[in-house]
From Swiss-Prot:
Gene3D superfamilies cross-referenced by the UniProt entry: 3.30.300.30, ACP-like (1.10.1200.10), N-terminal domain of ligase-like (3.40.50.12780)
GO MF assignments: 2,3-dihydroxybenzoate--[aryl-carrier protein] ligase
Protein name: Pseudomonine synthase PmsE
Taxonomic classification: Bacteria, Pseudomonadati, Pseudomonadota, Gammaproteobacteria, Pseudomonadales
Keywords tagged on the record: Ligase, Phosphopantetheine, Phosphoprotein
TM segment ranges: none
InterPro entries: ACP-like_sf, AMP-bd_C, AMP-bd_C_sf, AMP-binding_CS, AMP-dep_synth/lig_dom, ANL_N_sf, ATP-dep_AMP-bd_enzyme, DHB_AMP_lig
Organism: Pseudomonas entomophila (strain L48)
């Protein structure tokens, strides 16, 4: 029995084999080849623990045999949720060896996400941590049973009962070895999670052939080798940290993965110094924190050579700081769990590295950039990204409706990204057409949060949109129509938390409005909501900026002439220039003719609306 998935057309599959991309070997070959070449080399450092490639192989084989002893194997699935610990990789290789297909949930996911995943894959096996709030007691058993997905076997990290202790199963061989085998190389190896825009993430089946090539190709582009010391500080389950090139790329090259609980700068700097880490992969929000903290700790970063940044668009202004502040080379990454991975190359020009997201890793990655009618746009013009290739999937798991809208007749996948092709042949990401918020690399689907907000008994309508943020790139703003005009934001966030969503999905800002703006066909007018966010942000900025210029501690009366607060003509000219820099065309003469905060708010709002 195998897991169903949408396969590649035969002609393309044969082409990928002929080119040597698909080698018809399971992902376990990565570990096997390392054990043959360097069994005593370090594979993982996790706190005070060290694991060689030989030990990683032995421990994962013990667990695979124990699982096979329970009757688990090919055709079965596993829901796995572990923090950044060595057990994550021991479990991964054990499941791959046993032919059990894992779905690795992020450690930030809570009851709502976990039960939704379980409902989709109906796992025979659950592996989790007592450290996580969902598994601190045994209430989770009922939660999984309620969705018809009670696992046959549950193993928990931190469990004291040997019968359910993950550590005990890893360290204690069964009474006799039991045979096990991975699924065929052209079958599903694991599920990845989409950054979906329609609620709970859709599942992405990745085969051994395509994922193996994904990791190898990325490792080659990033020049990983046996001397690579790679810091895993972003969740290990992220596709970025698993295969782009991530841990699988490091293992393929014979390097060592150093585990970090989080990307918190000071603890990571200590790990970099202690273990001579030379490569790290981070999301932009984490890089911003590193850039702030690094000047006082530069001596701890002497071994750091490469910083890979992905998961969200990296601002040019931050990118340019990396070499000078962190003392290492920047490599931008633009990829997706569905497949296509782009990198700036290590020998690219500074401008390419600072201002683009690179180009595909494979010669057979096909991309097209088209308008809404599917017509290719002119070079340098923004358009929708569509792609297909040897490691880009051909369909979401059991999702025919989504697949019909995500793929065209030629098999190109439409990612929802808006990109520009630069003269150098690199891609620059300029936006997104999906209704999704990218909060520091974590994807928040607007529809999911909107549907949960209206479950509150006092909420009639809800709309969620992105708002810009310097640290995270984007944050979320929820607009809510309520029967109770006194309803407060904390009550709505409490409501969402009680439903069991991940904390990063909580709206950063919540605003009550009298009526929800709708389009002509009755849908929420997200354009108007984004306009309201822009107006509010500009109002706040304008008031704050005026108080800086005036140097007055008093609250500003919106109707008072600003001249009487000490504002002069030069300052008004400066404000006009700053507003222009923010994309708001307002002249000095217009501001000077009606120098009140209320008038300026109205003028700026009118210009924003017109734009």
């Amino acid at each position: 029995m195998t897991i169903e998935f949408t396969d590649w057309p035969q002609d393309r599959a044969q082409r990928y084999r002929d080119a040597g991309y698909w080698i018809d070997q399971p992902l376990t070959e990565i570990l096997h080849s390392r054990c043959q070449a360097q069994p005593q080399a370090l594979a993982i450092i996790c706190g005070e623990r060290r694991f060689t490639y030989g030990e990683l192989d032995t421990l994962s084989s013990i667990l695979a045999s124990r699982l096979a002893e329970q009757g688990l194997g090919q055709g079965d699935t596993a829901l796995v949720q572990l923090p950044n610990v060595a057990e994550f990789y021991i479990v991964l290789f054990a499941l791959l060896k046993a032919g059990i297909v894992p779905l690795n949930a992020l450690f930030s996911h809570r009851r709502l996400e976990l039960t939704a995943y379980a409902k989709q894959i109906v796992p025979k096996l659950l592996i989790a941590s007592r450290e996580h709030e969902v598994f601190r007691d045994d209430a989770y058993v009922q939660a999984f049973a309620e969705v018809g997905a009670a696992p046959a076997v549950t193993l928990l990290l931190g469990e004291s009962d040997p019968a359910a202790s993950l550590a005990h199963w890893i360290e204690t061989p069964g009474s006799q070895p039991v045979a096990y085998a991975p699924t065929a190389a052209d079958q599903v190896a694991l599920f990845q999670l989409s950054g979906g825009s329609t609620g709970i993430p859709k599942l992405i089946p990745r085969t051994h052939n395509d994922y193996h090539y994904n990791a190898r190709a990325c490792a080659d582009v990033c020049a990983l080798n046996a001397h690579t010391r790679f810091l895993c500080a972003v969740p290990a389950a992220h596709n970025f940290l698993l295969s782009s090139p991530g841990a699988l790329g490091v293992f393929h090259a014979g390097g060592c993965v150093v585990m970090a609980a989080s990307p918190e700068p000071l603890s990571c700097f200590a790990l970099v110094e202690q273990h001579e880490v030379n490569t790290v992969a981070l999301v932009p929000s984490a890089v911003a924190l590193w850039l702030q903290a690094a000047p006082a700790h530069r001596d701890k970063l002497q071994s750091l050579a490469y910083l890979q940044v992905g998961g969200a668009v990296f601002a040019d202004s931050l990118a340019r700081q990396v070499p000078g502040v962190l003392g290492c080379q920047l490599q931008q990454v633009f990829g997706m769990a569905e497949g296509l991975i782009n990198y700036t190359r290590l020998d690219d020009s500074d401008e390419q590295i600072f201002t683009t997201q690179g180009r595909p890793v494979s010669p057979d990655d096909e991309i097209k950039i088209v308008d809404e009618q599917g017509v290719p746009v002119a070079p340098g013009e923004p358009g929708m990204l569509a792609t297909r290739g040897p490691y880009t999937f051909c369909g979401y798991y059991k999702a025919p409706e989504q697949n019909a809208s995500a793929f065209d007749a030629e098999g190109f996948y439409y990612s929802g990204d808006l990109v520009v092709l630069t003269p150098s042949g690199d891609l620059r990401v300029v936006g997104r057409i999906k209704d999704q918020i990218n909060r520091g690399g974590e994807k928040v689907a607007s529809e999911e949060i909107e549907n949960l907000l209206v479950l509150h008994p006092e909420v009639t309508h809800a709309g969620l949109v992105a708002m810009p943020d310097e640290a995270l790139g984007e944050k979320s703003c929820a607009f809510v129509v309520s029967r109770n005009p006194s309803l407060k934001a904390p009550a709505l966030r409490r409501h969402l938390m009680e439903l069991g969503i991940a904390e990063y999905k909580l709206p950063d800002r919540i605003r009550l409005i009298e009526a929800m703006p709708l389009t002509a066909v009755g849908k929420i007018d997200k354009k108007q909501l984004r306009h309201l966010v822009s107006v509010e942000n500009t109002r706040t900025w304008l008031q704050t900026r005026l108080r800086q210029l005036i140097e007055d501690s008093e609250e500003l009366d919106p109707e008072e002439n600003l001249i009487f607060y000490g504002l002069d003509s030069l300052q008004v000219m400066k404000l006009a220039a700053e507003l222009k820099a923010r994309g708001i065309e307002v002249s000095f003469e217009e501001l000077a003719s009606t120098p009140t905060l209320a008038s300026w708010w109205a003028l700026v709002e009118a210009r924003q609306k017109a734009a």
